[in-house]
Amino acid sequence: MGSGGDLGGRTNSLRRLKRLNILFKLPYNTQWGQNLMIIGSDALLGAWVVEKGQRLMPRQEGDVLVWEVSISVSERFETEYNYVVVDDRFRGLRRESGARRVLSLPEGLSNGATVEVHDLWQDSPETLFTKEAYRKVLFGDEACKSTHIEGELSKDPTQCFTNVPLNPSAVVVQFKIANSVLHPDQAVFVIGSSSELGQWNNEAAIALSNTVGYSWECLVSISRTEFPVSYKYILKNSSGVVTYENDENRVLSLSLSAKKSSSVLIAADGSFRSKPWRGAGVAIPVFAIRSTESVGAGEFLDLKLMVDMAVKTGMRLVQLLPVNDTSVNMMWWDSYPYSSLSVFALHPLYLRLQALSNKLPNDIKEDIENYRKQLDMKEVDYEATLAAKLSIAKRVYNLEKDLVFNSALFKKYFDENKGWLQPYAAFCFLRNLFGTSDHSQWGLYGDFTQEKLDKLVSPMGDYYDAVAFSYYLQFHLHSQLAEVRDYAMKKHVVLKGDLPIGVDRNSVDTWQFPSLFRMTASTGAPPDYFDMNGQNWGFPTYVWEEMAKDNYGWWRARLSQQMAKYFSAYRIDHVLGFFRIWEMPDHAVTGLMGRFRPSIPLSTEELEREGIWDFQRLSTPYVRCHILQGKFGDRWTEVAENYFDEFEHLCYQFKEEYNTEKKIISATTLKDNASSFAIQEAEADRTRLFDLLHEVILMRDRDDPSKFYPRFGMDKTVSFDELDDHSKNVLKSKYNDYFFHRQEQLWRDNALMTLPALLNSSDMLCCGEDLGMVPACVQPVLSELGLLGLRIQRMPSAPGQEFGNPADYEYMTVCAPSCHDSSTMRAWWEEDEGRRERFFRNMLGLTDPPPETCDPHVSHLILQQHLESPSMWAIFPLQDLMALKDEYAKRPANEETINDPTNPRHYWRFRVHIPMETLLCDDDFVGIIRDLVVSSGRATSKDFDLSSSSIVPAVRDHELKHVNKTVSGKRLDDNKIIIDRTYSGEGLDVAKPVVATSYFNTIVTA
């Protein structure tokens, strides 16, 4: 028996494997010159190498191109795969979003049988709903917990074919659909034209089973004579209520080439077609929150109040600025939240002192309360607040450090975080010891080694108590922010963090990982809406080649080991920096004299071919006698003698000691006791000298003098104006090519190398801040990778537009009327009368003179425009929401600005003037926001109890004072909203429904 069994086993293993055909089919409209490839893990599909994949062939079916390819495989074939759009040279242009597809063949097929795989292109919106923000926070995995499912759940969908007999006269169809927005008592069904699908009878619909995650599948054997089959997916709840998916019927047809041999058809139908989900959120820096318990600035635990506000108003997200420690200079300069001392450590400014211990001595409690009262000021006093918190924390530390360090929670935290925590604590100790964060001045400790670190942080060392204080602070900060995370998740509110593009050059990260940073350069942005001189943030640029050696481990750790602990969504600050970064030499102060890295420069050869040869004239500041006279008037000879050398008659060059921006600043900075007039004159001279220093057309590459970069805005220089016409035309052409054409593929490739490593390192929803000078390659890449873009109405991305129209925004965006880098909605309204009138007329469609201030009526309309936009998220600064009520809009509007990007030393100290507890108790204010959110479809009555509140746009008593001015003669457009409640206000007595147009001063009876 044993021998026979062995022989039988060998015979079975040696039998010839059956050959099967797989026909991949995908509808996708490409552009001219583009093709589709299928690539995958198997060698037949190129082993993920695009050029070695299988090319699909197109054919026209109505208005759609349908792509097909057939491959012959063995019966044991299995693979992961995806589709890629390629150009005519088979270079990848666009990849599908989301996870890799998986294919395993069913058992029991006859030799030569065909398996048809009907796929749909995986777009970003479909895949985003598998992110933690939706899956765990917003929907709470409810889509995977349906209780109204008929049949058994199939945990391995590839094995379910074995239970279905294969009939030569029929085709076994596997229907596959994803649905992430599903209520617990709903299930997914398929219904269609064939008898097997119930012939459109809801009662005979076929139930799908939840397999894994949000995937739902079923098997149906359909007679070949029934094809083509029309069908739809539907949802049924326990009460029998049916919800049909949107759009036209789906159609399933057998391929002509395999009509007779097809045995199995896999209909991978993407996602359930429903109205796109949209949400609303509120944005606030932690430091700006005011509460009855916070000391001097907002604290992590204050975020619970923001979560409560979100819940009460129907908002589903709270967005923050970076929360990392920025204590580089130990003064108010550190209020800048984007200049990280450590990309892992949290900022002690956000510590809740009262939560350090439940056994605080009375004297410490009294001191905390005294500090709270003293620091309860209009704005944040950064230095005093941080000093108070560190002082109290140190006293509690001295009392309870042994208790904390011996706790299981601390030991677990330390073990999980010591890789960054120990270097951070050592850095803080050395910063305090040497009085500077500039580690180049630390002597022996200036160069980081593990041996030096181990000595510094040794529990046996003389400095351990000072080092361990940082452990203590970070543990409590972590505990408090983690408490907020858990609270927000329980309330189904997304916490959204912010990932800064740079780090301070005097930081833990540049000390510990110096090879990752280019310390002789500085990061910024070219001139744009924010600053006509460009921005220079002072951060070192990245050595991406070095980072790539460990697959961008430093970036991945930032996300997986820090941000993902607390947030389920994040914003990439200046996502354009992952395509290319604007880089200045370290002696620059402004951002004007920068270049893109990476970029393809202009070569000496290509310029000489076009008749450009005087590179010295073009690449050095163009300073001539008449230019000096125009700048300095009668003082020009004095200035020329002090700052310049005359290298030819009436031609000047900067002296060595004044030939950079930093040198000019040093030369024009007066002593503190100088008169205000002298200081003003020196600053005016500095500006004029900067202008002369910027009289450059081409900038030489510092590593290769034969390469040049066009100076941004070179055509606005006197140097350019005094060139001959031929040179102007050539240089202008090269300028346009450099900035707008020749870099596109390079920048696309660069982003596709770096961004996926970040995105794949966590399950957070990712949004990219893509404002400013945006290359053409950016939007396709963001869409391909599943990143949401940002749309600020006053900063439209389309050329020639003054204002963006929220109704035209793409779904994969976050929209807002303002952001932390701009003035608020109210302040912007007051800045420019002409612009205000154009906006009022062109964007609000109103002909009356606009109010001088952005009153609640105007604010209401602007917010409503954004809420009704197609954008996935509408996220509003809290200041813009407070503009909805006169009582909260009395503060001067310019005091609500968080940042002034034109000022590199801006003091980030804005603080909301109303405690959050007061806002939460204001039912009228909360109701206005809630009504706006609900009426826009970004929340429903199921999201909260609306039994005592209307769910229509807020037309409240204080908004009716001007109604009688425009009560007649207004056109009712497609945006009209029926309001089913009665109002009686000044000039209006309505006893039947009214129709409100988008501006609520315009109300007419219906």
Regions picked out by a protein language model, each given a short descriptive name:
Residues L20-P27, V171-N179:
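A short, amphipathic beta-strand motif
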Residues L103-Q122:
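C2-type phospholipid-binding modules
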Residues S13, S154, T158, K965-S968, ...:
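Serine/threonine-rich intrinsically disordered cytosolic regulatory regions enriched
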Residues G5, G969-R971, G985:
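Small-residue-biased low-complexity repeat regions
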Residues N29-E78, V86-G108, V181-F227, K236-S257, ...:
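Aromatic-rich carbohydrate-binding modules that target alpha-glucans
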Residues S146, E150, T162-P165, S221, ...:
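Catalytic cores of glycan-processing enzymes that make or break glycosidic bonds
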Residues G2-R15, L120-L166, S193:
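Peripheral membrane interaction modules
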